[in-house]
């Protein structure tokens, strides 16, 4: 009787274990959260747009958007603020992705803004800080009311304070007193005329999460994210790529180094890191061992 009782009890326990819901992994939880955010925005807003530069965060964001609405096409336009100082490999990648998935891309040009007198060229040649005006002009012209960005809270203090839904006023300004509480997965997209909401589906991701997701999903990236030989020069402790923007200067000398980029942006302020990481797995090992954030390192 005792043996029979134990056998029956064990069978019941095994049956419960077999039907118990499986716990999601860290990546599965982050993916589900991001997909929910994309669908929430599609339901709340009229003209959402995805900022797409060809950088790894925007690439992952687009991949998640495609998953969120598959097999239907992505219901959002893409927007890229082109500084005119972008890495050629990244621009080629951007155009290839847009063509492959038959997406609509709007390009806001910093050079056009300079020519129109909306912004002035900086003495140091950097155009990274000049992107705000053409971005806001594009948002106004196309009446975008939600703007997806690839910002993550682990990148820097300025981004750590952002909510997932970040309300911006008519001038694109962020006011902490006007931000709404975000309880669980409830998001408030209410906004007034001329205002818009920045949306950050990757807020809770880390750089390592992004790379592990890239590895899991087999996502292709621009080649400059992996180790390659490149002409660079040293300025303020960073390896910068020479270009029409104004480098190198004075005693700065160009040399060839094996480098890769942890983040991509304006060539004038995006530094490379010396690296031998040729594959996604190599990059994951490198990032896991790093004690500097990508912003701090580059």
Predicted region positions:
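Nucleotide-activated chemistry modules centered on ATP-dependent adenylation/adenylyltransferase
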Residues: 2-298
């Amino acid at each position: 009787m005792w043996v029979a009782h134990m056998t029956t009890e064990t069978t019941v326990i095994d049956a419960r274990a077999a039907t118990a819901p499986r716990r999601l992994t860290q990546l599965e939880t982050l993916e589900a959260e991001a997909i929910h955010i994309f669908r929430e925005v599609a339901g709340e807003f009229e003209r959402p747009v995805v900022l797409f530069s060809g950088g790894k965060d925007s690439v992952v964001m687009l991949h998640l958007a495609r998953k969120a609405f598959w097999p239907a096409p992505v219901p959002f336009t893409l927007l890229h603020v082109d500084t005119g100082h972008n890495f050629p490999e990244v621009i080629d990648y951007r155009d290839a992705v847009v063509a492959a998935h038959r997406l609509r891309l709007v390009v806001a040009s910093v050079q056009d803004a300079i020519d129109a007198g909306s912004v002035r060229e900086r003495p140091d040649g950097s155009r990274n800080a000049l992107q705000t005006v053409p971005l806001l002009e594009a948002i106004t012209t196309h009446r975008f009311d939600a703007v997806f960005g690839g910002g993550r809270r682990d990148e820097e203090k300025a981004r750590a304070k952002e909510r997932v839904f970040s309300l911006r006023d008519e001038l694109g300004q962020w006011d902490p007193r006007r931000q709404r509480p975000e309880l669980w997965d409830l998001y408030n997209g209410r906004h007034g005329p001329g205002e818009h909401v920045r949306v950050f589906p990757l807020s809770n991701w880390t750089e390592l999460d992004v790379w592990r997701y890239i590895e899991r999903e087999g996502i292709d990236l621009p080649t400059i994210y992996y180790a390659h030989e490149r002409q660079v020069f040293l300025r303020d402790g960073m390896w910068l790529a020479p270009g029409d923007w104004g480098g190198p200067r004075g005693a700065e000398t160009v040399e060839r180094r094996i480098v890769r980029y942890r983040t991509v942006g304006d060539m004038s302020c995006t530094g490379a890191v010396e690296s031998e990481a040729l594959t996604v797995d190599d990059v994951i090992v490198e990032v896991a061992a790093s004690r500097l954030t990508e912003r701090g390192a580059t």
